[in-house]
Amino acid sequence: MTAVAAPSVRTGILDCVQVNLAVLADRRHGPGRHLALGAKLRFRPRPGPDGLPTVDPPPEDQLREGAALVGLRPDAFARRVPADGLRALAERAPVVYAVADSYDMPWLPYAGRAHMDHSFLAGTHPDGAEVEDAYDNETAWGPARPGRWTYPWERLPTASFACALTPVPAHRAPRPELSLDDPAAYVEAYTAHPDRLAAARRLTAETWLLTRARHLHAAYREHLGERLDAAEHLRRWDRLTATAFIAQRRAERGRPVPGGLLPELASLLTADREVFAVRPHRPRPIRTTTQATEKP
């Protein structure tokens, strides 16, 4: 394994679909471009696994919106792409962005253990396929760290979709935007779910996604020069994510989970509106001088 050549990318605040899009954004447009992936802070739950709501968007939607935010355009887009199809695409493009099942990715700790949508980059190499993945996370099976690996093409998973990403000229930085639904129904769904272990496992993933999204949004606002008083709020989100993981481990052992987890989630989701409120842009006042004139 070799390190990913994108040191400007803040991998620790990106999810597994965003992070490799971020690598290409900075590679094509320069350091910091990837932070525009955080321009739109959303809380819009949709139906998810185990009858629980999720904030995890469909990967294809996430790619298309994210690419537009950072000034990239998906080209040669294809669904259900086997390894030989990825190879054919890579022979026509500098690099291929793909999303597949993490269970089938030999470079990840999830390989053979956990199913989830996960992105990677693939290119040609004299020894086969060069895989690049900037995912950065601690998992139950060990750390996942950014890197490059070389595999025979047949070792690559079938992608649910794959494409090339082309730079868009004259791209303008997106303005910050919020779209935050009322959190009551979301929190109640986790509170009332009859399978406490399933709820605890899902909530661990949800808080991880929610926390990274808020860190990314704050980083983008600061990148634009805005002074955002969000440090303590973000620390509370970090603590909530850690508490959710502890709650999952306790639930797996048949032990009671911390009682304040869901009330704190509700409190933080409610506070997002004020902490991340987009204030109207106020241009600096223009100083004018008035010249005195004599009356005739």
For each of these PLM feature ranges, what is it?
Residues 2-28, 34-160:
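Conserved active-site-adjacent core of cysteine acyl-enzyme catalytic domains
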Residues 10, 176-180, 196, 233, ...:
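Intrinsic-disorder-associated interaction segments
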Residues 11, 53, 173-177, 201, ...:
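Charge-dense, low-complexity intrinsically disordered segments
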Residues 20, 62-65, 85, 182-186, ...:
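Exposed alpha-helical structural elements
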Residues 26-30, 220, 278:
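A structural signal for alpha-helix termini and helix-coil/disorder junctions
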Residues 55, 163-165, 286-288:
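Hydrophobic transmembrane signal anchors and adjacent membrane-proximal interface regions, especially
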Residues 128-223:
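Noncatalytic regulatory segments and standalone regulatory/sensor domains
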Residues 221-296:
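Charged, long alpha-helical assembly modules
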